[in-house]
């Protein structure tokens, strides 16, 4: 295969790097998006955290968002030192409920993710929670007896001002139960981890070192995409490696996280990565202003 230079904006962008010639393409497969897509501002949302997004749900929870801006952490990894103090959910009956954190932690995130993690037909709420002394953890909340309650949480990273960024939610190992993919410390040699909710706890399912799905200070968190890269019926994860000058396709098939392929980029990945409506094309904005369009090979 060889590189072919094309203009920006074409359906398939192939570019000439410094070294060898290789075509960048994605094998078409099933693409799983998050169960609730982001909305700029869901109808009826109040107390929305600045520069954050509400998400819509199709079940009992019709919308979820972060609010009650607080300044007690001061990390500023997402562009300012304002974080969320309360997690909100609006229900089908129009009622809005919330879970307010105590003074020892914040929601260091810009969007809530909705997904049914345990197969009970009801979405859980997935968000990054940061402790003022111990850094970040992935937290799962759920609707219990009409209230938002904490269900499970990964261990704190253990050091103040250490953060993690979610990368995807899908059944990455093919066992019929979704995993949550995160990159732990994406700015200092990130580790990709897969977690699954089981028995009321988040259980580690695999990890692989060497990824970065965020640029420090950026509000763009969506630097990943989920798709079936190797056409084996099990979805994989596409995300940048450390330095964000290449993309990796990681599989959890077989129970072990491993890299299937790497795709060099002509500049650092900026994001957000987006999929077309059919899940056939991934658009990858770069820091130099170019847009790399990655499509299935025909």
For each predicted feature, which ranges?
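Short hydrophobic alpha-helical segments enriched in small aliphatic residues
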Residues: 4-6
